[in-house]
């Protein structure tokens, strides 16, 4: 475990108390971050985020999952909230703490934090597959093409696809769904790791493209799938209400955002708040050994709302520029 000397710790605490941190920022200043998408060619979506020296790479892979018919509607609805499967792996080269078995606990903790962030009902409800925007000429051609394909498929069986319907990620309602495996790799760490992870995951989901699938029911009720090989014939994800995390760390009597690795070594307590673009709170998790009084918690949450919306606006602007 990394350590910091008493003199270094005192220097950082006094700087935070005087609103002048060791890197020149004030208590609520966020470091600049960079986003790159489409980094992993064979993934359905990917993104790389660099927050100072903290660097995270996320890839998204889509697979068809069969839901057993005997599952009740309540269990099925609950299972729908698990259409996203998260896995985090911290590279040993990113930090001495990640060497050997040092990263095992952190990998599990970060993965579960992402699961909690995305388990909010409003996140799953609004994270839908949407149709791509097609020009009028192409749309007419596609309608002709689909009509011709439909006549051919009538001879083989009934087309029962409902991709992109109101049931999140559904291919055949109640039977087959898309499951998205979101795998993250921590390439380097200089503090505020989970915030960087949440930014990278949201960016990767925005970059995700899922091929259109037709589910065809045969004569004996068996279902086969026809996956479009047209790279333009895809579905994308609506991420408008997908949150990111803002972590607020208490050092001494004050709290700061976007901590460096050295600042984290001086931490008394922290609060990680999931915020979406509407400034709604999607998750809250406390860490650290010290307690937090209600007044401080309210101040932290209000700060997280303001900072979170600001970061999301920057993200959406950056992702729009990348897409264009």
From Swiss-Prot:
Keywords: Cytoplasm, Exosome, Nucleus, RNA-binding, rRNA processing. Pfam families: RNase_PH, RNase_PH_C. CDD domains: RNase_PH_RRP42. One of its GO terms (molecular function) is mRNA 3'-UTR AU-rich region binding. Its main location: nucleus. GO terms for biological process: exonucleolytic trimming to generate mature 3'-end of 5.8S rRNA from tricistronic rRNA transcript (SSU-rRNA, 5.8S rRNA, LSU-rRNA); nuclear mRNA surveillance; nuclear polyadenylation-dependent rRNA catabolic process; rRNA catabolic process; TRAMP-dependent tRNA surveillance pathway; U1 snRNA 3'-end processing; U4 snRNA 3'-end processing; U5 snRNA 3'-end processing. GO terms for cellular component: cytoplasmic exosome (RNase complex); nuclear exosome (RNase complex); nucleolus. InterPro entries: ExoRNase_PH_dom1, ExoRNase_PH_dom2, ExoRNase_PH_dom2_sf, Exosome_comp_Rrp42_subfam, PNPase/RNase_PH_dom_sf, Ribosomal_Su5_D2-typ_SF. SUPFAM superfamilies: Ribonuclease PH domain 2-like, Ribosomal protein S5 domain 2-like. It is found in: Nucleus, Nucleolus; Cytoplasm; Nucleus. It comes from the Eukaryota. Belongs to the RNase PH family. Non-catalytic component of the RNA exosome complex which has 3'->5' exoribonuclease activity and participates in a multitude of cellular RNA processing and degradation events. Component of the RNA exosome complex. PANTHER family: EXOSOME COMPLEX COMPONENT RRP42, EXOSOME COMPLEX EXONUCLEASE RIBOSOMAL RNA PROCESSING PROTEIN. This is Putative exosome complex exonuclease RRP42.
């Amino acid at each position: 475990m990394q350590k910091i000397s008493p003199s270094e710790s005192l220097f950082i605490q006094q700087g935070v108390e005087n609103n002048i941190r060791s890197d020149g920022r004030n208590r609520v200043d966020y470091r600049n971050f960079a986003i790159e998408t489409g980094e992993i060619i064979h993934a359905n979506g990917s993104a790389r985020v660099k927050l100072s020296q903290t660097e995270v790479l996320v890839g998204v892979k889509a697979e068809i999952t069969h839901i057993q018919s005997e599952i009740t509607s309540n269990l099925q609805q609950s299972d729908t909230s698990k259409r996203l499967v998260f896995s985090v792996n911290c590279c040993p080269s990113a930090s001495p703490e990640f060497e050997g078995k040092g990263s095992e606990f952190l990998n599990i903790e970060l993965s579960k934090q992402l699961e909690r962030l995305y388990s909010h009902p409003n996140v799953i409800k609004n994270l839908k597959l949407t149709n791509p925007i097609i020009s009028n000429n192409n749309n007419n051609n596609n309608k002709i093409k689909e009509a011709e394909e439909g006549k051919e498929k009538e001879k083989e069986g009934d087309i029962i696809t409902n991709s992109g319907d109101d049931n999140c990620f559904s291919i055949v309602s109640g039977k087959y769904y898309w499951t998205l495996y979101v795998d993250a790799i921590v390439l380097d760490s200089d503090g505020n790791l989970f915030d960087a992870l949440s930014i990278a995951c949201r960016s990767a989901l925005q970059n995700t493209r899922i091929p259109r699938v037709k589910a065809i029911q045969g004569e004996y009720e068996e279902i086969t799938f026809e996956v479009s090989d047209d790279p333009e014939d895809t579905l994308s994800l609506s991420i408008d209400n997908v949150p990111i995390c803002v972590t607020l760390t208490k050092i001494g009597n004050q709290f700061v955002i976007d901590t460096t690795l050295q600042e984290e070594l001086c931490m008394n307590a922290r609060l990680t708040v999931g915020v979406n673009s509407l400034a709604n709170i999607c998750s809250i998790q406390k860490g650290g050994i010290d307690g937090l009084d209600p007044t401080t918690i309210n101040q932290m949450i209000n700060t997280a709302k303001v900072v979170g919306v600001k970061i999301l606006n920057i993200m959406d602007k950056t992702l729009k520029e990348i897409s264009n």
